[in-house]
Amino acid sequence: KNGLRKVAEAHPDWIAGDFAIIGEPTSCGIEGGCNGTIRFDVVTHGIAAHSARAWMGHNAIHDAAEILRRLNEHTDATVSVDGLVYREGLNATLISGGKGTNVIPDECRVHVNYRFAPDKSLAEAKALMMGADCGAELGNGEHQATGGVFEGFGIEMKDESPSARPGMDSELTRSLAALAKAR
């Protein structure tokens, strides 16, 4: 959303290099690498009915309680990569469902954001959340989670970005860190 992708696609030579410094104002310190992210909807389905005859339907929002239970019981990992510590996070960030105040909802979506440490690839992160063979990819609709935290639920991918290893094994990185620490 900041336009960097357009620059990278139009002028890859502008960003080619052996080393990069990205300004990050938080604490003005050096942070190596970054967590990756996958964002996806976990979907429940019900049967719409008038709320005066709720027994004729099935409430998809009520079924979302199981999704929230799994999120609540999940323990976020703390992972060390190249001597740096990364904290993972698995959180619901949005919930949507229902079409009216007197209609039993036939769908509910819990939007989930998983921030994963640089010891994992995108594929490994997805496998932990939805199973290795779920098939959910950006733009290909809803797929059934075959394993992972959300096994049995519908999954629709919304966004993904790989993690970045810290590169502390690079002489350039070590030199910069030593220089910054000395000042």
Predicted region positions:
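Acidic/histidine-rich catalytic neighborhood of metal-dependent amide-processing enzymes
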Residues: 1-39
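Metal-dependent amide/peptide-bond hydrolase catalytic core
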Residues: 25, 32-33, 39-183
